[in-house]
């Protein structure tokens, strides 16, 4: 993913593009128009993902939704842009919660997101 305003490349864990991808340069390796970006947080990247990286992503005109998934517990942060340009925040913290996307018609329970995750394993 290329962000021309900051002259910055990054590789999100997941991204969703609406309609046709727009590419940087003549190749077809690097897109510039992510609608939704999902990052799985680790202890080493979580602060960066929440601050500078989110700032870089917000420079993409098509970007409307940012999902941060904690890998150590049931916890998902959702940021989405309203029509007036303001960003709203929602946190889901229970295995009974459902993540409902605002930019596309899709939802997924946290139980499904965290399926087969063993929270008792320690980070190495």
List the predicted regions and their residue ranges.
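C-terminal interaction segment
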Residues: 1-60, 65-124
């Amino acid at each position: 993913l290329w962000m021309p305003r900051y002259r910055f490349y990054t590789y999100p864990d997941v991204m969703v593009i609406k309609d046709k991808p727009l590419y940087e340069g003549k190749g077809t390796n690097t897109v510039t128009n992510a609608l939704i970006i999902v990052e799985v947080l680790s202890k080493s990247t979580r602060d960066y993902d929440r601050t500078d990286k989110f700032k870089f992503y917000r420079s993409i005109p098509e970007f409307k939704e940012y999902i941060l998934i904690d890998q150590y517990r049931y916890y998902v942060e959702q940021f989405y842009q309203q029509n007036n340009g303001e960003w709203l925040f929602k946190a889901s913290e229970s295995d009974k919660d459902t993540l409902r996307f605002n930019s596309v018609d899709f939802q997924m329970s946290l139980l499904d997101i965290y399926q087969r995750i063993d929270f008792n394993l320690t980070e190495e």
